[in-house]
């Protein structure tokens, strides 16, 4: 009896050992190919009928029970509908732009000055009062990448720098005039073939070294919209979709007064709404200024989120709060009035506030102490 039990136990152990060896030596199943992954992703989104439905469309169907739900048969169609439904439904509550602040990003691609197109928007009445200061400071070092967009002929300005574009737009500070200039800026950038488009106003100082570092951390072929919103929530607008139909739309936008940048990859996708005069008609759909229209095209129509960057500064913020020890890291600065007080960065330098109310000359000497007109004994 004992011998029989022992024989059975040995046979059971041998069988278990053989099964383990077969499992260990068997080839693992091959990983799914990309197309199969796509089909599985679509199946995971499918309802009982086996047909995938884009998120956001279910909510729309629930709001209108009789409305048909669009069927999705491929990943590309799914993401297209996802973008469209995001535009229609609006951003989720508390949604915010992706931040670019924090530790420096690794370099994605080295950039040369000729890779960047900086458009400076101005008007003829400010050629002397504002542009002369920029030409004396940061533009003097970076004429190759800077293009001035104005609304009137100025032979003296044209002789001083070769990159002056008379847009023939109105000199009024109106929604239509601002959009007219932005339309010309966009078209000139596309024609230039450069990698990055950056827009600033004539009251901005651009720290080009910091700008190149920032842009170099993003591939220009990807969809990148960099800037700083002036609002703490998405702007709400009314989008005209036909003669008798409007609908609400929500989106973030980077304020033009602080400057913003757009990659070439994204700018090319904006073409149906921005090129060849389409920008002005797009602006009329929401009846908002040029910088808002940029945000509308990028966020609401293309579904690309704004990347918030605190290194851009406008006169709408308290510039006294920018630490003097971090001025070399800032991409743009500004000046003006804030709460009925003079608003400029706080920096010690060779020029008094009376002689340098914008503090741009002092900032320039801080960044470029070898400038010929900067005092050699300057203390910052």
From Swiss-Prot:
<dbReference type="GO" id="GO:0001541">
    <property type="term" value="P:ovarian follicle development"/>
</dbReference>
<dbReference type="GO" id="GO:0033829">
    <property type="term" value="F:O-fucosylpeptide 3-beta-N-acetylglucosaminyltransferase activity"/>
</dbReference>
<keyword id="KW-0217">Developmental protein</keyword>
<dbReference type="GO" id="GO:0000139">
    <property type="term" value="C:Golgi membrane"/>
</dbReference>
<comment type="similarity">
    <text>Belongs to the glycosyltransferase 31 family.</text>
</comment>
<dbReference type="GO" id="GO:0007386">
    <property type="term" value="P:compartment pattern specification"/>
</dbReference>
<dbReference type="InterPro" id="IPR017374">
    <property type="entry name" value="Fringe"/>
</dbReference>
<keyword id="KW-0333">Golgi apparatus</keyword>
<feature type="site" description="Cleavage; by furin-like protease">
    <location>
        <begin position="87"/>
        <end position="88"/>
    </location>
</feature>
<feature type="disulfide bond">
    <location>
        <begin position="365"/>
        <end position="374"/>
    </location>
</feature>
<keyword id="KW-0479">Metal-binding</keyword>
<dbReference type="GO" id="GO:0030217">
    <property type="term" value="P:T cell differentiation"/>
</dbReference>
<feature type="glycosylation site" description="N-linked (GlcNAc...) asparagine">
    <location>
        <position position="168"/>
    </location>
</feature>
<keyword id="KW-0328">Glycosyltransferase</keyword>
<feature type="compositionally biased region" description="Pro residues">
    <location>
        <begin position="90"/>
        <end position="107"/>
    </location>
</feature>
<feature type="binding site">
    <location>
        <position position="202"/>
    </location>
    <ligand>
        <name>substrate</name>
    </ligand>
</feature>
<feature type="disulfide bond">
    <location>
        <begin position="198"/>
        <end position="261"/>
    </location>
</feature>
<keyword id="KW-1015">Disulfide bond</keyword>
<protein>
    <recommendedName>
        <fullName>Beta-1,3-N-acetylglucosaminyltransferase lunatic fringe</fullName>
        <ecNumber>2.4.1.222</ecNumber>
    </recommendedName>
</protein>
<dbReference type="GO" id="GO:1902367">
    <property type="term" value="P:negative regulation of Notch signaling pathway involved in somitogenesis"/>
</dbReference>
<dbReference type="GO" id="GO:0045747">
    <property type="term" value="P:positive regulation of Notch signaling pathway"/>
</dbReference>
<dbReference type="GO" id="GO:0001756">
    <property type="term" value="P:somitogenesis"/>
</dbReference>
<keyword id="KW-0735">Signal-anchor</keyword>
<dbReference type="GO" id="GO:0014807">
    <property type="term" value="P:regulation of somitogenesis"/>
</dbReference>
<dbReference type="GO" id="GO:0008593">
    <property type="term" value="P:regulation of Notch signaling pathway"/>
</dbReference>
<keyword id="KW-0325">Glycoprotein</keyword>
<feature type="binding site">
    <location>
        <position position="203"/>
    </location>
    <ligand>
        <name>Mn(2+)</name>
    </ligand>
</feature>
<keyword id="KW-0808">Transferase</keyword>
<dbReference type="Pfam" id="PF02434">
    <property type="entry name" value="Fringe"/>
</dbReference>
<feature type="active site">
    <location>
        <position position="291"/>
    </location>
</feature>
<feature type="binding site">
    <location>
        <position position="315"/>
    </location>
    <ligand>
        <name>Mn(2+)</name>
    </ligand>
</feature>
<feature type="disulfide bond">
    <location>
        <begin position="169"/>
        <end position="180"/>
    </location>
</feature>
<feature type="topological domain" description="Cytoplasmic">
    <location>
        <begin position="1"/>
        <end position="8"/>
    </location>
</feature>
<feature type="transmembrane region" description="Helical; Signal-anchor for type II membrane protein">
    <location>
        <begin position="9"/>
        <end position="29"/>
    </location>
</feature>
<keyword id="KW-1133">Transmembrane helix</keyword>
<keyword id="KW-0464">Manganese</keyword>
<dbReference type="GO" id="GO:0051446">
    <property type="term" value="P:positive regulation of meiotic cell cycle"/>
</dbReference>
<keyword id="KW-0472">Membrane</keyword>
<feature type="topological domain" description="Lumenal">
    <location>
        <begin position="30"/>
        <end position="380"/>
    </location>
</feature>
<feature type="binding site">
    <location>
        <position position="130"/>
    </location>
    <ligand>
        <name>substrate</name>
    </ligand>
</feature>
<dbReference type="InterPro" id="IPR003378">
    <property type="entry name" value="Fringe-like_glycosylTrfase"/>
</dbReference>
<dbReference type="GO" id="GO:0046872">
    <property type="term" value="F:metal ion binding"/>
</dbReference>
């Amino acid at each position: 009896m004992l011998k029989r039990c022992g024989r059975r136990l040995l046979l059971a152990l041998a069988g278990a050992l053989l099964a383990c060896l077969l499992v260990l030596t068997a080839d693992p199943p091959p990983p799914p190919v990309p197309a199969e992954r796509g089909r599985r992703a679509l199946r995971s989104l499918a309802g009982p009928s086996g047909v995938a439905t884009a998120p956001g469309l279910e909510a729309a169907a629930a709001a209108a029970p009789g409305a048909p739900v669009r069927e999705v048969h491929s990943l590309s169609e799914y993401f297209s509908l996802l973008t469209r439904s995001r535009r229609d439904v609006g951003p989720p509550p508390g949604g915010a732009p992706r931040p670019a602040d924090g530790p420096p990003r690794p370099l994605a691609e080295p950039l040369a000055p000729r890779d960047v197109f900086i458009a400076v928007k101005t008007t003829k009445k400010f050629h002397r009062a504002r542009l002369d200061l920029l030409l004396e400071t940061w533009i003097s070092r970076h004429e190759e990448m800077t293009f001035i967009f104005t609304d009137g002929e100025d032979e003296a300005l044209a002789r001083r720098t070769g990159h002056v574009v008379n847009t023939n737009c109105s000199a009024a500070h109106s929604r239509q005039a601002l959009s007219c200039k932005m339309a010309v800026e966009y078209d000139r950038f596309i024609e230039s073939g450069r990698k990055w488009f950056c827009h600033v106003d004539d009251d901005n100082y651009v720290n080009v070294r910091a700008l190149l570092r920032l842009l170099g951390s993003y591939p220009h072929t990807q969809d990148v919209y960099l800037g700083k919103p002036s609002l703490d929530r998405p702007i709400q607008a009314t989008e005209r979709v036909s003669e008798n139909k409007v609908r609400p739309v929500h989106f973030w936008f980077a304020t033009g007064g602080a400057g913003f940048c757009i990659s070439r990859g994204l700018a090319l996708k904006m073409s149906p709404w921005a090129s060849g005069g389409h920008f002005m008609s797009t602006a009329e759909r929401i009846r908002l200024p040029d910088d808002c229209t940029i945000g509308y095209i990028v966020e609401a129509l293309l579904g690309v989120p704004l990347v918030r960057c605190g290194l851009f500064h406008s006169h709408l913020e308290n510039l006294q709060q920018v630490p003097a020890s971090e001025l070399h890291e800032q991409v743009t600065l500004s000046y003006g009035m804030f709460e009925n007080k003079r608003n400029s960065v706080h920096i010690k330098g060779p020029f008094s506030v009376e002689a340098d109310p914008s503090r741009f000359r002092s900032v320039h000497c801080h960044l470029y102490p070898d400038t010929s007109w900067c005092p050699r004994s300057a203390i910052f």
